[in-house]
Amino acid sequence: MLIAFQGAVFALVLLSFVLIVAVPVALASPGEWERSQRLIYAGAALWTSLIIVIGVLDSVVANQA
Protein backbone atom coordinates (compact mmCIF):
# COMPACT_ATOMS: atom_id res chain seq x y z
CA MET A 1 0.00 0.00 0.00
CA LEU A 2 2.95 2.29 0.62
CA ILE A 3 4.02 1.98 -3.03
CA ALA A 4 0.55 3.05 -4.19
CA PHE A 5 0.74 6.05 -1.86
CA GLN A 6 4.17 7.05 -3.15
CA GLY A 7 3.04 6.58 -6.75
CA ALA A 8 0.00 8.80 -6.17
CA VAL A 9 2.15 11.52 -4.59
CA PHE A 10 4.60 11.32 -7.49
CA ALA A 11 1.73 11.59 -9.98
CA LEU A 12 0.38 14.61 -8.10
CA VAL A 13 3.74 16.38 -8.15
CA LEU A 14 4.23 15.62 -11.84
CA LEU A 15 0.72 16.77 -12.76
CA SER A 16 1.19 19.92 -10.68
CA PHE A 17 4.31 20.86 -12.62
CA VAL A 18 2.52 20.23 -15.92
CA LEU A 19 -0.42 22.40 -14.88
CA ILE A 20 1.88 25.15 -13.57
CA VAL A 21 3.30 25.47 -17.09
CA ALA A 22 0.21 24.68 -19.18
CA VAL A 23 -2.37 26.95 -17.56
CA PRO A 24 -0.49 30.27 -17.88
CA VAL A 25 0.57 29.41 -21.43
CA ALA A 26 -3.02 28.60 -22.40
CA LEU A 27 -4.32 31.80 -20.83
CA ALA A 28 -1.62 34.03 -22.33
CA SER A 29 -1.68 32.72 -25.89
CA PRO A 30 -4.39 34.12 -28.17
CA GLY A 31 -6.94 31.45 -29.02
CA GLU A 32 -5.16 28.76 -27.02
CA TRP A 33 -7.68 28.81 -24.16
CA GLU A 34 -10.53 27.80 -26.44
CA ARG A 35 -8.52 24.88 -27.83
CA SER A 36 -7.17 23.55 -24.54
CA GLN A 37 -10.01 24.37 -22.16
CA ARG A 38 -11.29 20.78 -21.88
CA LEU A 39 -7.79 19.42 -21.35
CA ILE A 40 -7.06 21.90 -18.57
CA TYR A 41 -10.38 21.18 -16.87
CA ALA A 42 -9.65 17.45 -17.11
CA GLY A 43 -6.22 18.05 -15.57
CA ALA A 44 -7.78 20.04 -12.75
CA ALA A 45 -10.32 17.26 -12.12
CA LEU A 46 -7.54 14.67 -12.09
CA TRP A 47 -5.52 16.85 -9.69
CA THR A 48 -8.52 17.13 -7.34
CA SER A 49 -9.11 13.38 -7.53
CA LEU A 50 -5.47 12.70 -6.70
CA ILE A 51 -5.76 14.91 -3.60
CA ILE A 52 -8.71 12.84 -2.38
CA VAL A 53 -7.00 9.53 -3.23
CA ILE A 54 -3.84 10.60 -1.41
CA GLY A 55 -5.89 11.54 1.64
CA VAL A 56 -7.54 8.12 1.71
CA LEU A 57 -4.26 6.29 1.10
CA ASP A 58 -2.57 8.34 3.81
CA SER A 59 -5.13 7.25 6.38
CA VAL A 60 -4.71 3.61 5.30
CA VAL A 61 -0.91 3.76 5.41
CA ALA A 62 -0.95 5.56 8.78
CA ASN A 63 -3.17 2.85 10.28
CA GLN A 64 -0.82 0.11 9.07
CA ALA A 65 2.23 1.61 10.75
Swiss-Prot record:
One family name in Pfam for this protein: Ycf9
Primary location group: plastid
Residue ranges of the TM segments: 8-28, 41-61
Single biological process term from Gene Ontology: photosystem II stabilization
Membrane topology according to the record: Multi-pass membrane protein
Annotated signal sequence range: none
Key words, A-Z: Cyanelle, Membrane, Photosynthesis, Photosystem II, Plastid, Reaction center, Thylakoid, Transmembrane, Transmembrane helix
Gene Ontology CC entries for this record: cyanelle thylakoid membrane; photosystem II reaction center
Quaternary context: PSII is composed of 1 copy each of membrane proteins PsbA, PsbB, PsbC, PsbD, PsbE, PsbF, PsbH, PsbI, PsbJ, PsbK, PsbL, PsbM, PsbT, PsbX, PsbY, PsbZ, Psb30/Ycf12, at least 3 peripheral proteins of the oxygen-evolving complex and a large number of cofactors. It forms dimeric complexes.
HAMAP family given in the database record: PSII_PsbZ
Name used for this protein in its record: Photosystem II reaction center protein Z
Species of the source: Cyanophora paradoxa
Organism lineage string: Eukaryota, Glaucocystophyceae, Cyanophoraceae, Cyanophora
